Regions:
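Catalytic NTP-binding/metal-coordinating core of nucleotidyl cyclase/transferase enzymes
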Residues: 17-79
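Active-site core of bacterial EAL-family cyclic-dinucleotide phosphodiesterase domains
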Residues: 166-183
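Alpha-helical scaffold within the catalytic cores of cyclic-nucleotide enzymes
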Residues: 50-61, 82-106, 118, 123-132
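Residues that mark the start of a beta-strand
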Residues: 21, 107-109, 182-184
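Sensory coupling linkers of modular signal transduction proteins
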Residues: 1-39, 135, 147-161, 168
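A short glycine-enriched loop-to-beta-strand structural element that forms part of the catalytic core
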Residues: 63-75, 100-128, 138-147
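Catalytic-core segments of nucleotide cyclases and related cyclic-nucleotide turnover enzymes
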Residues: 12-15, 89-92, 115-138, 157-168
Length: 185
């Protein structure tokens, strides 16, 4: 006998497409930007960055919240995630194209958590992804799902200025991978 699953398949697709995705965005070199800017230029540069980020986020039909002077939280649905992957997280290039001073350009790191069973775990994976992006030199997007990391961007040369931080970040990421693994050899 046959079982009609069309409606159940459609509901599954709708459910998967509407799953939440969390992204934490961070301006990597915020302090350097502020030092390079004249007082009169700072708010204009930050407004330009905010405008570029908001325009990019609008494609995801989600919400972009500025949580700190150089941190943003972006929440959107899974159905828009592939758009950002297809465009290779073009916001990295868009933000980097803003010129603040000679040889000073803002860079952005993005940590994304997806495919998590709960919102707190989604946020935790986004934070872990951001830490991984920063440990790899910043200026890139890192996506963490339940299994592994995916990396996008990272075209600028990494500057090694946080060796203790990098060691801690890598240790935390390594610990998370071991904790999530079923078997470790």
């Amino acid at each position: 006998y046959w079982v009609e699953t069309t409606e159940a398949d459609h509901l599954r697709e709708v459910y998967e497409a509407s799953r939440p995705v969390a992204a934490i965005l961070m301006l990597d070199n915020y302090e350097d930007l502020m030092k390079a800017c004249e007082d009169t230029q700072r708010s204009a540069v930050l407004a330009q960055i905010d405008e570029k980020l908001q325009t990019w986020a609008n494609a995801g039909q989600g919400i972009l919240l500025k949580t700190d002077r150089n941190h943003y939280l972006f929440l959107f649905e899974e159905q828009y995630f592939q758009h950002f992957v297809d465009e290779k997280f073009s916001i990295l290039d868009t933000v980097r194209a803003i010129r603040v001073a000679e040889n000073i350009h803002p860079t952005l790191s993005i940590g994304i958590g997806k495919d998590s069973p709960s919102i707190p775990e989604l946020y935790k994976n986004a934070k872990l992804s951001l830490e991984m992006a920063l440990s790899r030199g910043g200026d890139q997007a890192v996506v963490r799902n339940q299994v592994d990391f995916a990396f996008y961007g990272g075209r600028t040369k990494a500057t090694e200025k946080r060796t203790k931080v990098k060691s801690r970040v890598m240790a935390n990421a390594f610990r998370e991978l071991i904790a999530d693994a079923g078997e470790v050899y």
